[in-house]
Amino acid sequence: MELENIVANTVLLKAREGGGGKRKGKSKKWKEILKFPHISQCEDLRRTIDRDYCSLCDKQPIGRLLFRQFCETRPGLECYIQFLDSVAEYEVTPDEKLGEKGKEIMTKYLTPKSPVFIAQVGQDLVSQTEEKLLQKPCKELFSACAQSVHEYLRGEPFHEYLDSMFFDRFLQWKWLERQPVTKNTFRQYRVLGKGGFGEVCACQVRATGKMYACKRLEKKRIKKRKGESMALNEKQILEKVNSQFVVNLAYAYETKDALCLVLTIMNGGDLKFHIYNMGNPGFEEERALFYAAEILCGLEDLHRENTVYRDLKPENILLDDYGHIRISDLGLAVKIPEGDLIRGRVGTVGYMAPEVLNNQRYGLSPDYWGLGCLIYEMIEGQSPFRGRKEKVKREEVDRRVLETEEVYSHKFSEEAKSICKMLLTKDAKQRLGCQEEGAAEVKRHPFFRNMNFKRLEAGMLDPPFVPDPRAVYCKDVLDIEQFSTVKGVNLDHTDDDFYSKFSTGSVSIPWQNEMIETECFKELNVFGPNGTLPPDLNRNHPPEPPKKGLLQRLFKRQHQNNSKSSPSSKTSFNHHINSNHVSSNSTGSS
């Protein structure tokens, strides 16, 4: 029993480390798997792709890199990219150095005598920016100037890009991105835990070596529990939210028995484990503050999509290899219709907000209550309305949430106590974060006085704790309870519409990030000498014929060897080849 767990963990750790070889977990055939199609095969994509500058040149990571490469080959455009890079650097500069960095940008790019002067930024805007810089520099100082540059780039430069080999290469990447995804796209490793409809296991993309967590939703279990809308809702929300503080959906596919969500793998365990199983319960305030800030950023990204999470609790906050956190398990999240409120008594006992317990209509307010519960628990080492391991009925916990005030020990600083009280205000209308400004209001609380959120969002701040890379922060394989077999449920063609909505393959932004992070983009994104067209982008160069299979090569060789034979034997042999060829094709298509 113990041996099985050791073997499973050893295999997983080796996969996480890249297998110990130069390929870093990639298949021997990874270049074959990611071989570009000839550009002639991308014409349908060219006709149908949405030609939106923001999407193609900014939001999509590979699109952004290729547009930059295009600009760097055009005299006069390179300085615009350099200016945008400088503005991005300015926004993550420490507050005390903003003035100095701002002056550098003004002098280099917004002064007429400069060799890289950005003429497209109007003089009135330059004067306003300079005045604000002299008064008090802020993070958003150059936002309007950057917007002005983007407005210029989305014009003639963007249209030139669409006719360039760089956009053709982007179409090749999109063609690869849209290839079918199946269970054979991945290697499967040990079970990490259980979800509502099935197991969660570690997996690895064969082509890139990137590790993910695969959440299996058993088809029969979904159908028995009538969970189709819940499963599809989670998938669609994950697909739309692109946040470094929320687990990302990279792939969605189906097998004969299950629907599979391939998600960011978080190897560092959950906050519940770290609060209660690593020394004395709770964290030092500095560590609690860091996690609270990242959770707040994740909520802000969800709320930007008008999505309320509704299930904030320590076990749903996961740590990655480096100690950063992400919000996971969006099964109870729901998108709120524009200008509307929703109702629903869902969540976890002890963490549900008063308005949820009272079955009142609400918007995003339950998430700020949940944040208050989390900050309290991280510092105190127990939840605000229930003692650690306290045996108490659900009704009593609900009563405490509605009627009693939480108790604060010596562990809380005045700022920590203040933010918890303001987030745990029972009247949602008076709660911190529930006004028009939302997360921005919470960020201004004195508890976060020393937190530079721009640098945090850019991944430039070191976490207070880094998980052990040689540890597997989950239960032993045999301690994870297995699901029972679902009986009395049959799958039929009426389920196919739901499966087709779910199994949509790769998700653009995570897939493109995977190509960049695993250096597949760097290795494959090669053009001809001195910027010339490579054969796969040359319309006058016919595409390479597909490689022949082993059987075809053997038959060809045998045919050549027998070409000197008598006509009768040759006819007989050809008949034999044709028979085998038909048989082989039949087998291959099954």
From Swiss-Prot:
It comes from the Eukaryota. Residues 563-590 have a biased composition (Low complexity). The keyword Transferase applies. Keywords: Apoptosis, ATP-binding, Cell membrane, Cytoplasm, Kinase, Lipid-binding, Membrane, Nucleotide-binding, Nucleus, Phosphoprotein, Serine/threonine-protein kinase, Transferase, Wnt signaling pathway. SUPFAM superfamilies: Protein kinase-like (PK-like), Regulator of G-protein signaling, RGS. Highest levels in heart, placenta, lung > skeletal muscle > brain, liver, pancreas > kidney. It holds the Pfam family Pkinase. Changing L554A: No detectable plasma membrane localization. Induction: Overexpressed during heart failure. It catalyses: [G-protein-coupled receptor] + ATP = [G-protein-coupled receptor]-phosphate + ADP + H(+). This is G protein-coupled receptor kinase 5. It comes from Homo sapiens.
